[in-house]
Curated annotation (Swiss-Prot):
InterPro entries: Endonuclease_NucS, NucS_C, NucS_N, NucS_N_sf, tRNA_endonuc-like_dom_sf. One of its GO terms (molecular function) is single-stranded DNA endodeoxyribonuclease activity. This is Endonuclease NucS. It is an enzyme of class 3 (hydrolase). It comes from Beutenbergia cavernae (strain ATCC BAA-8 / DSM 12333 / CCUG 43141 / JCM 11478 / NBRC 16432 / NCIMB 13614 / HKI 0122). Its EC number is 3.1.-.-.
Amino acid sequence: MRLVIARCSVDYTGRLTAHLPLATRLLLVKADSSVLVHSDGGSYKPLNWMSPPCTLRVAEPDDDDVGRGVREVWTVQNAKSDDRLVVRIHDVLSDSSHDLGVDPGLVKDGVEAHLQALLAEQIDLLGSGHVLVRREFPTAIGPVDILARSAAGETVAVEIKRRGDIDGVEQLTRYLELLGRDPLLAPVQGVFAAQEIKPQARVLAQDRGIRCLVLDYDAMRGLDDVDSRLF
């Protein structure tokens, strides 16, 4: 991983257009070719990014950029779309690279991991006709618990929690924003699945067009035998 702290401006073009004016920022270049732009705030969410597959090309600035004090231009081009991230670097304050090796991945809570495995096996709980695409679908900001397709062929991203709160909805929102940039996946529906969903989280999810799904852990494990109940 390469970490560069630099005074830079950033422009994103493609399905979306965004501009970040000149400021000091952290640029992350990961081994999977993804590039993320961070500020000293906003928690762990980048200001902008380009997810893989993409290529990074470093070039000398043209005369106009030189006149504005630009010393180096990074062009990050997505391999599957016209999305492009252009970083104009004025000053580099720090530049270091580190080999992090192979990461073992996130070790999820035992119940959450089991819920994910059970939902992948019982994908029709999302709705009739849904099919599993992949568990732990990789993105530049972490793996999506489950990626599926609806009967209509639309992409469905599922975030699974034992107890669903606002942080879980925010996490899913970031995944949806990122996945929605990929023309092969867009549009992407979101499903927030948990054993228990807090009222505030449900309201936030519904406001963002995210469907909520309450998971019955015992029933999914086959422990809730309705025919054997006395009441």
